[in-house]
């Protein structure tokens, strides 16, 4: 039998989503499809591992199946795909029980499988689930049946992108367009041996792309990439998707925690924030009510109207992350940035995607921006094109922070206007490879490029009240067209001559018709 290739795998997996269409919201497809995909993969690979143990260790098949030492994930009998696939009644409950059993035997999967529930028979009747099981039964996902084991991770990335496209604005909650991720990773340049952290990791794309970048640049240790991947995600379903994403990409030592990064960061060592070599993120744009502790007990005035919480007095962070200022309640952008800055090592580099407003808004945000510039943390600002993201059409920017800037960039900021570097689409624009390469080369070259890049001294930024609006530093106006007056006069004369000819012919026709004498 021919081995499963990437094209067939992608189409097969995406067709499974079409079975669900009309029964559940498209934004929830990923939770169910990835759960079943992982169950099928884990079960198929479980039996392949048993066969390998029989061949290499000389044990009998029953022992190879039952001994946990022979398996990456131990799959109990009630979770074997063969057992699930033959169910005709109460299929959803059987799947939920299988997921619970897998978690009992595999502590690293705690909460991952049970993040989604199949037991709602009104939403997922047996007839529908039976079709899904039959569909997934078509191919084996064991390594020996794949053209290359890597295609499983590639197909997972493909599905995430398809689900994001299908979900519209909701897609932006768990997925950043791959081209934006590639640009960001190439700007911060993770290296072999680095620890990499994403505080709002979504489905894990930025972490995985960082690891791929390291691998492409010789950072392999045997079959594994020489790096440490860590992240945190607030949404339970998206966290589970990210955990499975790490598994299918073979990043077995990744550490993805669930929870609110701002209110309760999870990567703590001896009571202190863990620090990292590279920090990368695309946090939710302009998140309001970002400090949940201040939103729990909203006071009311004498008329019974809610009193807006005073974040300046209510935000109290035990880790001292907001020492440059408390961002306003309506805009959490610089709260995420300061969190990332706090977990960045002294020789580390970070990149964050934020809306343009953080570059010029005043009040507390202006004071935070001034402090970041005065401390010489900001290395570069890159303005991106509009309509790149699923959940907003507004243009965004990339901010690169480097705690150990090279001497030639001390008290200077690279500002790049890449807003015109895109391929236009019907609903969404994309960065093309040439645009990414142009931006990265400009950043690395550290030379002014007319209408595209400037290295701006801090003194000039100070004169502009620490406003980083890109248009203040790079002339983005189009060149005025030089008009040849003589050509214009000649064209007007030609038009007037043709007008006379038309009038003459019109009069001739009117005479024939008897309207004029």
Description of each model-found segment:
Residues 1-192, 257-266, 383-386, 410-419, ...:
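Non-catalytic, mostly N-terminal accessory regions of nucleic-acid modification and defense proteins
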Residues 2-4, 263, 270-517:
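A conserved structural/catalytic subdomain of Rossmann-like adenosyl-cofactor enzymes
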Residues 8, 12, 234, 332:
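Soluble or luminal CAZymes and related metallo-dependent hydrolases
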Residues 18, 141, 165-169, 196, ...:
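Glycine- and acidic
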Residues 19, 139, 158, 162, ...:
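Conserved, well-folded catalytic cores of nucleic-acid-processing
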Residues 40-53, 163, 214, 250, ...:
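A generic secondary-structure signal for well-formed alpha-helical elements
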Residues 170-281, 285-305, 334-335, 354-357, ...:
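Conserved S-adenosyl-L-methionine
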């Amino acid at each position: 039998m021919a081995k499963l290739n990437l094209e067939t795998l992608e189409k097969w997996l995406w067709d499974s989503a079409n079975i669900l269409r009309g029964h559940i919201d498209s934004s929830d497809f990923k939770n169910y499809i990835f759960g079943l995909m992982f169950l099928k993969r884990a079960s198929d690979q479980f039996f392949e591992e048993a066969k390998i143990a029989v061949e290499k260790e000389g044990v009998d098949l029953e022992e190879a199946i039952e001994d946990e030492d022979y398996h990456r994930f131990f799959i109990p009998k009630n979770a074997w795909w063969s057992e699930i696939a033959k169910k005709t009644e109460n299929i959803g409950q059987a799947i939920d029980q299988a997921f619970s059993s897998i978690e009992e035997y595999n502590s690293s999967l705690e909460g991952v499988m049970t993040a989604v529930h199949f037991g709602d028979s009104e939403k997922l009747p047996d007839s529908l689930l039976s079709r899904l099981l039959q569909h997934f039964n078509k191919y084996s996902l064991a390594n020996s049946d794949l053209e290359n084991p890597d295609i499983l991770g590639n197909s997972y990335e493909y599905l995430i992108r398809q689900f994001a496209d299908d979900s519209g604005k909701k897609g932006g909650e768990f997925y950043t367009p791959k081209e934006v991720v590639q640009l960001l990773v190439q700007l911060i340049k993770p290296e072999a041996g680095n620890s990499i952290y994403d505080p709002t990791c979504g489905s894990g794309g930025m972490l995985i792309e960082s690891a791929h970048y390291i691998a492409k640049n010789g950072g392999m240790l045997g079959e594994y990439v020489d790096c440490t991947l860590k992240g945190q995600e607030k949404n339970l379903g998206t966290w589970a998707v990210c955990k499975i994403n790490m598994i299918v990409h073979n990043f077995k030592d990744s550490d993805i925690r669930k929870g609110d990064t701002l209110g309760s960061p999870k990567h703590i060592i001896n009571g202190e924030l863990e620090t990292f070599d590279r920090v990368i993120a695309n946090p939710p744009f302009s998140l309001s009510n970002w400090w949940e502790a201040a939103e729990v007990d909203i006071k009311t005035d004498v008329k019974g109207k809610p009193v807006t919480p005073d974040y300046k007095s209510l935000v109290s962070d035990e880790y001292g992350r907001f020492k440059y200022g408390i961002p306003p309640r309506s805009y959490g952008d610089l709260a995420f940035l300061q969190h990332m800055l706090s977990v960045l090592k002294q020789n580390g580099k970070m990149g964050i995607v934020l809306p343009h407003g953080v570059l010029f808004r005043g009040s507390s945000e202006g004071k935070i921006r001034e402090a970041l510039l005065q401390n010489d943390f900001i290395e570069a600002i890159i303005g991106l094109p509009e309509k790149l993201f699923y959940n907003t059409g507004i243009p965004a920017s990339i901010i690169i922070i480097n705690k150990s800037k090279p001497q030639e960039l001390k008290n200077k900021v690279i500002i790049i206007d890449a807003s015109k570097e895109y391929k236009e689409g019907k609903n969404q624009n994309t960065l093309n490879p040439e645009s990414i390469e142009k931006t990265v080369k400009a950043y690395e070259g550290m030379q002014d490029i007319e209408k595209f890049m400037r290295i701006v001294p801090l003194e000039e930024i100070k004169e502009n009240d620490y406003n980083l609006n890109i248009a203040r530093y790079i002339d983005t106006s189009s060149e005025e067209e030089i008009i040849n007056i003589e050509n214009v006069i000649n064209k007007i004369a030609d038009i007037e001559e043709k007008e006379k000819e038309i009038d003459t012919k019109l009069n001739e026709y009117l005479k024939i018709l008897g309207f004029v004498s």
